[in-house]
Swiss-Prot record:
Family: Belongs to the PPR family. P subfamily.
NCBIfam families in the record: PPR
InterPro entries in the record: Pentatricopeptide_rpt (IPR002885), TPR-like_helical_dom_sf (IPR011990)
Protein name (Swiss-Prot/TrEMBL): Pentatricopeptide repeat-containing protein At5g14080
PPR repeats: 81-115, 116-150, 151-185, 186-220, 222-256, 257-291, 292-326, 327-360, 361-395, 396-430, 431-465, 466-500, 501-535
GO cellular component: chloroplast
Length: 634
């Protein structure tokens, strides 16, 4: 390994190690800066080294990446260049940190740093996909002003994005600039743009523009452009204009296909212009060309890839409504992507797919189900599952698991249970995750008895419960005042060798304290101390103290904390003192602090400082001043 690469690896690993647990968000801190100084590499820092550290080590930790980037800029004699900016923009792009990207780009402009064209391309694409097309426009302007060549596909995606996002003034400026600079237009960019432009333009102006663009850009698909224009005109009640330009479009190499003719014919049905409809249908038979499915396939995939989902949906609706052929993978892509913005249309695409004798891929159904749940469309979810069930779609473990888990997420408990029973009739054994999902759905719906019944069913079926099973049930039973039942489950899980987690201890203790079963709560806490990590015990202890005080047992909480092993847990002492202050139980607090002073005087200052800090953030700090003074007097 080369020395520069070795150093980048050392720095990257050190940053990840010092910044904390991989589960938590990694935040830049003075401790990290101190650690970097200890590595002693400041004399050899360079933009390429910064880039090697950020990519790959910090790509998924934007805060850490930005902290390291800014720290490097402060080192004597160092300045960033295109390479280091590329790496930080890449990290920020992955986590969609658009504000930070905008601030950095302003820095680039003010410092007159010349970025590589690949950095501009990446920035523009990221911003367009993040629906920040206006910001992307200014990035492109900067790239053009520095003489950079930006690939036409990037410019076309931006043109489509500006138009689709409603930034029409910017779209028009970009369109003019692309033509002026000789940047070629393609079907995606020009198609989305002309679909908007034709809504308010005169037909002569429209045809003249299309003719000029088509002659200069032979790669543009004329039939697709014709469909987009005619569809847009009909949408804004200009079906007569659409009718009159049919022949003109043919003359400028934009031959309307059968779908284009059908769009106008259907618009005339709506307006009652039946004579004109007949004329259009005759023209269709005489002059229309069959739509090339491969062309529309490529166009729809381009729209989906560019996240122009509304436009993709509208083109697909024209195809579906006319029962024109569409490949299965295109329907899969449409159902999965369009469901994010228009779940109703996505379900209609599914209905169309099934009517043609095709069925969706499991990943497509998963995306559709997820988005239906996100949009709170449980009725649509049921409709989709019933349709697929009638075609024998649910026949193996994976598809049944998907259906049941999403029915549970949608809160459709009865339908979930019915599906579970059907699954068992098919000879398929539900696994513990399915039972857990259904039990949790029952608990959320306040259906405790069915949840218990499912527990019994798991036992009969020989399905082994896991931590999640116990967690869900113990938490709910504790909430519902069934502490004895939750304790029974707790004992069973210990017998079966399943280690409780922090949530289980806290749920049990909270439920037992509410029911004034203090000794039982103490016993649960002792088991926590025997079995668990000190950090967990400390958090559970603080929660235990809070629950004791909340239920009128401040004296017992103070007594609990007087056990030697809890003395150093200062956070729990602060919880107690804050609770007794709020409850105006000053004497308990004073006696507790006197005891601490007797057994460990050094802790008094720490606890007092923490207590005062917690009161400073209180909504009514004045109310506890007498308590603080009384504590100080101890």
């Amino acid at each position: 390994m080369r020395p520069a690469t070795e150093l980048a690896v050392r720095i990257g690993r050190e940053l990840l190690k010092v910044s904390g647990s991989s589960r938590a968000a990694r935040i830049w801190s003075p401790l990290i800066e101190q650690s970097l100084h200890g590595l002693g590499f400041r004399h050899s820092i360079s933009p390429s080294l910064v880039a090697r550290v950020i990519d790959p080590f910090l790509l998924n930790h934007h805060s850490l990446a930005l902290g390291f980037f800014n720290w490097a800029a402060q080192q004597p004699g160092y300045s960033h260049d295109s390479i280091s900016y590329h790496s930080i923009f890449k990290s920020l792009s992955l986590s969609r940190q658009f504000s930070a990207m905008d601030a950095l780009f302003k820095q680039v402009k003010s410092n007159k740093i010349l970025l590589d064209s690949s950095v501009y391309r990446s920035l523009i694409d990221t911003l367009v996909l993040g629906r920040k097309a206006q910001s992307a426009f200014w990035v492109l302007e900067e790239a053009f002003s520095t003489g950079q060549e930006i690939h036409p596909d990037v410019c076309n995606r931006l043109l489509a994005g500006l138009t689709s996002d409603g930034c029409y003034d910017y779209a028009q400026k970009l369109f003019v600039k692309m033509r002026h600079k000789g940047v070629s237009l393609n079907t995606l960019g020009f198609g989305v743009y002309i679909g908007w432009f034709c809504r308010s333009s005169e037909t002569n102006q429209l045809l003249r523009l299309v003719d000029e663009v088509k002659k200069a850009n032979l790669n543009i698909n004329g039939s697709i452009i014709a469909l987009l224009i005619l569809h847009s005109l009909c949408k804004c009640s200009r079906e007569m204009d659409a009718f009159y330009i049919l022949e003109e479009l043919r003359n400028i190499d934009c031959k309307p296909d059968f779908m284009a003719y059908r769009v106008i014919a259907e618009a005339f049905v709506v307006t009652g212009n039946l004579y004109e409809r007949q004329v259009v249908l005759k023209k269709k038979r005489k002059l229309g060309v069959a739509p090339r499915s491969s062309d529309y396939r490529a166009f729809i995939l381009d729209l989906i890839s560019a996240k122009r989902l509304t436009e993709a949906k509208e083109v697909a609706e024209v195809i579906v409504s006319g029962k024109f052929p569409m490949d299965n993978d295109i329907l899969d892509a449409l159902i999965g992507s369009v469901s994010a913005v228009d779940p109703d249309s996505a379900v209609e695409f599914l209905v169309y797919m099934v009517s043609t004798g095709k069925l969706p891929a499991i990943r497509t159904l998963s995306k559709l189900s997820k988005n239906l749940c996100r949009h709170d469309k449980s009725d649509h979810l049921i409709k989709a599952y019933e349709l697929l069930s009638s075609k024998g779609y649910f026949s193996e473990l994976q598809s049944y698991s998907l259906m049941i888990s999403f029915l549970c997420k949608a809160g459709r408990v009865r339908e979930s249970y019915t599906a579970l029973q059907e699954m068992k009739k098919e000879g398929l054994a539900p696994d513990v995750s399915l039972y857990n999902a259904l039990i949790e759905a029952c608990c959320k719906a306040e259906m405790i008895r069915p949840a218990k019944k499912l527990w019994d069913e798991m036992f009969v079926e020989g399905c082994k419960m896991n931590l999640t099973t116990y967690n869900v049930l113990i938490r709910k039973l504790s909430e519902e005042g069934e502490a004895e039942e939750s304790l029974r489950l707790f004992d069973k899980m210990l017998e079966r060798g399943i280690e409780p987690d922090e949530t289980i201890y806290m749920s049990l203790i909270e439920g037992l304290c509410k029911e004034t079963k203090i000794e039982a709560a103490m016993e649960v806490f002792r088991k926590c101390m025997e079995r668990d990590h000190k950090t967990v015990t400390r958090r559970v202890l603080s929660e235990f103290v809070l629950n004791l005080c909340s239920n009128g047992h401040s004296g017992e909480a103070s007594q609990l904390l007087r056990e030697r092993e809890h003395l150093e847990h200062t956070g729990a002492h602060v919880v107690l003192l804050k609770c007794v202050a709020d409850a105006k139980e000053v004497e308990i607090g004073i006696r507790h602090m006197q005891w601490i002073k007797e057994v460990s005087p050094s802790l008094v200052h720490t606890i007092s400082s923490d207590l005062l800090a917690s009161f400073c953030s209180s909504s009514d700090p004045d109310s506890i001043l007498p308590f603080i003074r009384a504590i100080e007097n101890t």
